[in-house]
Amino acid sequence: MIATFIGHRKIQNSELLTEQIKQTVLNLIDEKQVDTFLFGSRSAFDDLCLETVTEIKKLRPHIKRIYVRAAYPYIDSAYEAYLLKFYDATYIPDKIENAGKAAYVARNEYMIDKADVCIFYYNENYQPPLKPATKNNTKT
């Protein structure tokens, strides 16, 4: 079975959140036979989950950590070797190659569709930073 993680770029990290992720992942491995974890990027939640799953991998070495890229369809061996220090495999789904600016959204949709279990981090009080005004879109 496959699990994935989706969450805000910025999170309010705490020991409680880390412990909740750890217990959830252990339960999925031990009770639901989840053995593959898909990760995205550009998210503090992804980073925390990768760190937690990597720690658990020391106890459950059969699990796999897969980095699903949203950019760089073709990577050289040096970059791949770098990624494989943290993950067991990496790839970019076919449908993402032509997604343009929506590549990260398309990647997340792909991971949700591919997974049997999705672990979400959602903070209803989270407000993403405002984008700066551009030449054609001025603030008033």
Question: Where do the protein language model's features map onto the residues?
Answer:
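Acidic/glycine-enriched connector segments
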Residues: 1-140
